Amino acid sequence: GSLGMGDLRESNTWLGPIISDRQRNRVRTHIDDAKNKGATVEIGGQWQGNRCMPTILTGVDESMTVCRQETFGPVTSVYPVDSPEEALEKANDSEFGLSAAVFTQDIDKALILAQSIKAGMVHINAPTIADEPHVPFGGVGNSGFGREGTDIDIDTLTEWKWITVQLPVN
């Protein structure tokens, strides 16, 4: 399949531009660093101006920036593992924890893993970019500043005060 890149106001467009030149350079640097250190670009990596096709990297290791920092672009790395325990260890070996995904046919095992993954959001058999406006959004560790969205924002931005009035009895 193909994901249309362009103007997000058009219905056939799935990918818009990277938000700024600074962020575009960060995404490019992460991809280039991984390639220069031996990672393989399985798909994507092409650019049209400030737009990057979704990029999947394999052969990524801890020496690569894309493994140790948040990229905030359409880039992901696939890490093969031999067991759920190894997957959990790899997932939690980071100072960041915004979002994670578990892909498996064993939903019971996925739910157990999801409880142990150090991330603010864990998606099972779904991409990490999914969010819902009625659910608090945020990460753990060095990802984010707590939670935002719905009642969380109201509580954060409000100082509650309770005022009562006793009316005089006539």
Model features per residue range: what roles?
Residues 5, 38-47, 166:
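Short secondary-structure junctions
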Residues 31, 36-37, 51-170:
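Conserved C-terminal structural/oligomerization subdomain of aldehyde/semialdehyde dehydrogenase
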Residues 14-16, 39-41, 45, 92:
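Conserved, function-defining micro-sites of small-solute handling proteins
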Residues 1-29, 46-52, 68-73, 134-135, ...:
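Flexible, acidic loop-helix segments that line cofactor/substrate-binding pockets
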